[in-house]
Swiss-Prot record:
MF terms in GO: rRNA binding; structural constituent of ribosome
A Pfam cross-reference name: S4
Full protein name: Small ribosomal subunit protein uS4
Disordered: annotated segments: 31-50
Keyword Secreted listed: no
Known function: One of the primary rRNA binding proteins, it binds directly to 16S rRNA where it nucleates assembly of the body of the 30S subunit.
Keyword rRNA-binding carried by entry: yes
Limits of the S4 RNA-binding domain: 98-161
NCBIfam families (UniProt xref): PRK05327.1, rpsD_bact
Source organism of the structure: Helicobacter pylori (strain J99 / ATCC 700824)
Assembly, per entry: Part of the 30S ribosomal subunit. Contacts protein S5. The interaction surface between S4 and S5 is involved in control of translational fidelity.
């Protein structure tokens, strides 16, 4: 499945939660979900009963949309999560959070994961001093993530850091905002990752 290219706020209303797809509007409280917290379309406010499979599929789609991951990539991450010791669902979320595009987003260098992905693919991000343009790269503990020198004054990056300053930085990352770099200090615990995803349903779906 290709990445979703449609109206993202309509998508958020369909899922009923913020997917952090519209950065500035979300942070300013002006998103469509803030104004109309029900599904889109003529029958958006009507409640319908969903099957177990429907709930599982919806949860997977929600996670893919939130993190901007294709079906092929998502399944590959699930396979790795299932291979690791521990809870598969928790492993899944922790692995996704280690993706380079997500880490750039978490550091506040972009207001959305989509914008963070563009920074990476266009070569504006350094990992341990070397340019890395692979959004799916899994960041390791202790690695330094930095915006390239020529990009540090980019208006979009500066604006993103102004907007994200109000939301704070997750506890597994240290950021030097003035110098526009951060350290991925450790792998996150599941309870630290605040996302509206029930990974248990995703595990159930892939385990069929």
């Amino acid at each position: 499945m290709a990445r979703y290219r449609g109206a993202v706020e309509r998508l958020e209303r369909r899922f009923g939660v913020s997917l952090a797809l519209k950065g500035e509007r979300r942070l300013s409280g002006k998103s469509a979900l803030d104004k109309r917290a029900y599904g889109p379309g003529q029958h958006g406010q009507r409640r319908t009963k969903t099957s177990d499979y429907g709930l599982q599929l919806k949860e997977k789609q929600k996670a893919k949309m939130m993190y901007g991951i294709s079906e092929k990539q998502f399944r590959s991450i699930f396979v790795e999560a299932n291979r690791l010791d521990g809870n598969t669902g928790e492993n899944l979320i922790r692995l996704i959070e280690r993706r380079l595009d997500n880490v750039v987003y978490r550091m506040g260098f972009a207001t959305t994961r989509s914008s963070a992905r563009q920074l990476v693919t266009h070569g504006h991000v350094l990992v341990d001093g070397k340019r890395l343009d692979i959004p799916s790269y899994f960041v390791r503990s202790g690695q330094k993530i930095e915006i390239k020198e020529k990009t540090k004054s980019n208006p979009q990056v500066v604006r993103a850091m102004e907007l994200t300053a109000q939301t704070g930085i997750v506890p597994w990352i240290d950021v030097e905002k003035d110098k526009k770099y951060g350290i991925f200090t450790r792998y996150p615990e599941r309870e630290e990752v605040v996302v509206p995803i029930e990974e248990r349903l995703i595990v159930e779906l892939y385990s069929k």
